[in-house]
Amino acid sequence: MIMPQTRLVVADNTGAKEIMCFRILGKKKVAQVGDIIVASVKEAVPRSNIKKGDVVYAVVIRTKRTIKRKDGSCVRFDDNAAVIIDKEGNPRGTRVFGPVARELRDKNFMKIISLATEVI
């Protein structure tokens, strides 16, 4: 459950380390895995393309909140993480760190799925 003011770890190599959500796209109060958010960069690597204070679009790939699946299984991650995307929905980075949830496949984020090392 990602709400406005929630800080997320950035799980790609764009140069941002941490972002803060301030808007959830669509008529939703909270964002789950696979939802697109608008966020502000709070911490970034020096000399990177993305600077502190930039407004970016991101897709949530991991949440601490338990994800209940149709088959009865539950999945929970250690952190809240997102991948920065452009307006078309393509990831801006070329690598995705850590596992991603399988729910991204249902939302048609195939490029992120292909870059991920592990899909759970």
Curated annotation (Swiss-Prot):
One example GO MF annotation: large ribosomal subunit rRNA binding
Keywords of the record: Ribonucleoprotein, Ribosomal protein, RNA-binding, rRNA-binding
GO cellular component, one term: cytosolic large ribosomal subunit
Pfam family, one: Ribosomal_L14
Keyword Ribosomal protein: yes
Domain of life: Bacteria
PROSITE patterns assigned: RIBOSOMAL_L14
Biological processes per GO annotation: translation
Subunit structure and binding partners: Part of the 50S ribosomal subunit. Forms a cluster with proteins L3 and L19. In the 70S ribosome, L14 and L19 interact and together make contacts with the 16S rRNA in bridges B5 and B8.
Family to which the UniProt record says this protein belongs: Belongs to the universal ribosomal protein uL14 family.
Function according to Swiss-Prot or TrEMBL: Binds to 23S rRNA. Forms part of two intersubunit bridges in the 70S ribosome.
Full protein name: Large ribosomal subunit protein uL14
